[in-house]
């Protein structure tokens, strides 16, 4: 059973699973080669940054790291995906792709369950 936890992204992510996986795979397949822990760090950093309105300072505090570390991790996401975190459309695509990964695709990359959204 899938919990939607009131999130439009969660609802969109699981509404048509096969279609969503096909749509977002090109966006995030560049992370598949990373270790589970390295991928989690990047995905968690992005999620916390988005949830805090793009504040590097707040994201750093919540992740127990310096804002420059958050900036570096976000830059790595931009480099890997070819998307810019200064463009709202790119941010939206990454949000959806990471939500689909968290809810539907994590099993194809590793065997650990996804970290629940905070």
Indicate where each model-derived feature is located.
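Cytosolic nucleotide-utilizing catalytic cores of signal-transduction proteins
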Residues: 1-118
